[in-house]
Amino acid sequence: MKKNKNNNQKAKIFIDKNSSLISFNKRILERLDKSDFPIFEKLRFCSIIDNNINELASIRLKEDKNLIKSLVSLKNEVDNKFLMYLFNIMKSNNLKLSKTFDKNELKELKSIFENKIKPNFQTIDNTKGINLRAISSGDTFFVARLENKEYIKNVSLEGYDLEDLYFMMENNEDIKPKKSVPEFILNFSRIDNIPRFYTLTTGKIVTLEMIINVLNNHIYKDNKFIDGGICRVIRYDNIEELQLDPELSTKKNLKKVHKRNNRSYPSLIEIDTDIDDKTIKLLAKSFNVKTNVINRFKLVGCSTAFNIDFNNIVNIEDKYFDNQKPFNNYDKDKLLETIKNQDVLLSHPYESYDTVIDFLKEGVNNPNVKSIYQTIYRVSSIDSEIIKLLCEGAKNGKDVNVLVEIKARGNEGMNLHIIDKLTESGVNIIKTYKNIKVHSKALVLKEIKENKINYYTHLGTGNYNEKTSKIYVDYSYFTYNKKLGEEVIQMFNTLDNKKDSKVSKGELFNYSVGSVREIICKELDKLDKALEENKACKCTIKVNGINDFDIVNRIYESARKGVVFDIVVRGECIICPIDNIKIKSIVGRYLEHSRIYRFEIEGEYDKLYLSTADLMTRNLSRRIESIIEIQDKKIKDEIINDLASYNYDNRNGFYQMKPGKWKYIDSVYPIDVQKYMYCKNNNKDTH
């Protein structure tokens, strides 16, 4: 916990950022223990935490060396949970993990290796030593310590004359080779895309590492196998060194990405518990790190271990979350007509993301739609429906303009390739700023009909990603509002012309760097002023994370004056529950991702905003985010009702009772907000 003294004001209390993130992941683990999620989904959640640990290790360890103990402890908890769930699956299906095999089973193991493992068993060429540049952060390998066949003790006499040899023999001195040859070498084989568990016809379960160890003589024919196991390397993410330049070619930017991914030093190396100390020392020497960077775990790469070949023996159907039903008040071929008559709000994943695809598809096929504008941050793949439709639109002769953010962490390489694909199809690529990320999510169809210009606009709180839309809770807002459409188009024009992003604002749509912070502070100023007239004031916030000290100080200031804050935050949270501040975290089956801000003055004022920005410094100070006031009464009421429903959840919720201390909310009469939202959006009875 940190205190920040500011003149005569009371000391401001903040939760440590890293402790907050560790706490969030522990909330997920606690929620899994109390949940009725299908067991395979519990495995998926464990893999999500594993990825979160990787991110912490790559980003935060450099500034906080003491964090390693907490990460290792959390990683061990996750491994234990994952293995417990995995063994429960095996037990319920009469399967057993085995280390002994008869002759027929050994033949089957060899067949599994040849057909399922070997095709993707990519061995790094280390004839001249380990090629560290070929090992990217997060890659999972089977590392084998092999006896070097070139090492022949006391035989390599090159460099000695006969007189020297005679003298050394007379004095019983060891004759060592003049040319240094290592006794052992390390062999790395990438296994990221290979299942970690397999089912034999006899019902036995065998691990990938067990197969390799049993068949080591068959696999490593040139050098004798001594020791081996699973290994994963997490490197420091030197994000400040990754200066991608939109003006450079894709090839040159990709070189920068690969350099960042492959040349930074390891912050954490995970290895199997069975790997011996000699192999650890050789790993440390090879990677030029201390042995304390290398840690043993029961399950290395939990997120990659989720790739399981169980021959579809497990039924993971669930009655509450079956096939999603799309918004059904329109003909999908006449979606634009529906939006022309009324604003539309979709709540994902409870309502299908296909509607967003259909919206773009109709724009591509509608002859009256002359131009398409879209932002791209994280899509599902280079071959996603979104990318295909944008290419199709350009090939059909439409004016397609796409802003692809090449600095999206982890997606830099794919986004650079997407730019090439779109460019080849004739899409106009709007280049982003070198030092500012564009995180806004917008899609506009410009229609020219009967000599009139119309705009159909989609704004979302989440990415244009068909895969994550199935598990992320987000809003899609569609409108025919001409003024709003013009202001969103202005954002694209401003970015395309590289005008000053700090002065780009509209009446309905704001997108400049710092605009979200400015709007929040102005709204809080109004609430503070209303308090002076003894009017009840309330601010409701729903975000993914809160870590900006200035905005937290501003919230503390209003809370001490009497503004009531109702905050729902999923992950990182440095704010404390002082008087007038209630903080709740929702950890459900779906990942809460929407950002909502509401400001109320009792009886006379009620402003509601949707945004792409969390209360994180990166969102508030270093990104172009979008924020829009919802004015349509029907949609506004729907979002307000959704916000209120989070207060009643006693199934997924944790309250922060004291600074950094969270308590799970339980009840004999469980209310699950996500099940309620699913039923509400699909016209199902909640009982």
Predicted features, each with a name:
Residues 1-539, 557, 561, 571-687:
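N-terminal localization/anchoring segments of enzymes in phospholipid and broader phosphate metabolism
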Residues 549-552:
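Glycine/threonine-rich ATP-lid/beta-loop region of ATP-binding domains
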Residues 568:
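The conserved SAM/SAH-binding core of class I Rossmann-like methyltransferase domains
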